[in-house]
Amino acid sequence: MNKLNSERIEQALQLLGERLALADVGPYGLVVCGGAALISCGLVSRMTTQDVDILAMINMEADFVSPDPLPDELLRIAFQVAEDLDLPETWLNNGPSREPGGLYQRGLPEGIGGRLTRRDFGERLTVYYVSRIDQIYFKVFAAVDSGPGRHVDDLRELRPSPDEIEKAALWAMTHDRSVEFRMVLASMLRQMGFKDVAERI
């Protein structure tokens, strides 16, 4: 199976939009975060990602709605795209916002809707890439919640200012108020060079 680079992400989404139109399905608005958004917006140097992560959907009234579950027709056509392009079956998924513990379900950063970058893939598919500052929020939470590795690597490349990292840390703590989460978060901030921020949270 092929990983997704910027060209493959573009190709997959373009084909998805075309197939949605042929099937007379949609339109769908997808808010995308994670590696696919970082790569497509040129925010990081890493070249590939495993999948396209759907954070939320946007309805015809331009409101955010839950992506759990994703529409069956969207999943069916995404599977066809996977077969055509030799991609993983779950290349398009709602992993970040699945079930009660998901990012959408816990609450998104204030004002996120006004910071999205829009891309149209035909008349039936619109993708909204999450902004740099919102990626910082999500990466801070993910690095503590599921472990460092690529999350911290991405976070370093996003080069947050002390003010940005502090706001992201405070937001992350609203999603997990445990002492353990705060301790791991503070340790990570110190390792990243934000000692003063770690002492304030």
Which role fits each region the language model picked out?
Residues 1-201:
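Compositionally biased terminal segments of proteins
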